[in-house]
Amino acid sequence: MFAVIKTGGKQYKVAEGDTIVIERLAAAAGETVTFDSVLMVGAGAGVTVGAPMVAGATVTGEVAAEVRGPKLITRKKRQRQTYRRTIGHRQDLMEVTITSINTDGKAPAKKAAAKKEEAPKADTAPKAAAAPTEEAAAGGDNLKKITGIGPALEKKLNAAGITTFAQIAALSADDIAKLEEELSLAGRFAKDGWVEQAAELAKEA
């Protein structure tokens, strides 16, 4: 038996035991996921085509691993200007092993991921370091001098450990992509030229 499912805007033809790589869903490794968008189901010579979905059909799989796709490099350039930008991106993906194809309208119970055993905490264990406070960040640079960085964004950068112009100027493409994802900056480093501004301000500091 095979089925054609739709997830993440793409279609996949699957059978029991197949492992597919899809865009990451809200599930951890070891958990069970159910795909309700089944476009076609086939068994032997019989094929059922949905309109657009096959009523009562579901496909169940187990999350094998969470992975990341290959790095995609985007380069931007403007003619007759010294404008060069390089941005890297890696898509969050997951490997799913198909465990069953159901056509009776009943999906198997979801399997939760096994919980990791936590080591006993000692009473004398040191407390985790708190996020940098304004006093801790006082020894750094005034990041608000960079165009596009205001007080709120400066606090977010300080909390991420970025307190000086030199740190921003030394960020690699991977570091920038990670920061933009964590702080929801969506290409602000390249758009506003923060690395170049930080490099100039670091020289003046």
Swiss-Prot record:
Low complexity composition bias: residue spans: 122-137
Pfam families, alphabetized: HHH_5, Ribosomal_L21p
Keywords per UniProt: Ribonucleoprotein, Ribosomal protein, RNA-binding, rRNA-binding
GO molecular function: rRNA binding; structural constituent of ribosome
InterPro entries the record matches: bL21-like, bL21-like_sf, Ribosomal_bL21
A single GO cellular-component term on record: ribosome
Disordered as annotated region, ranges: 107-137
UniProt-listed GO biological process terms: translation
Parts forming coiled coils: none
Function: This protein binds to 23S rRNA in the presence of protein L20.
Family named by the database record: Belongs to the bacterial ribosomal protein bL21 family.
Binding partners and assembly: Part of the 50S ribosomal subunit. Contacts protein L20.
Name of the protein described by the UniProt record: Large ribosomal subunit protein bL21
Lineage of producing organism: Bacteria, Pseudomonadati, Pseudomonadota, Alphaproteobacteria, Hyphomonadales
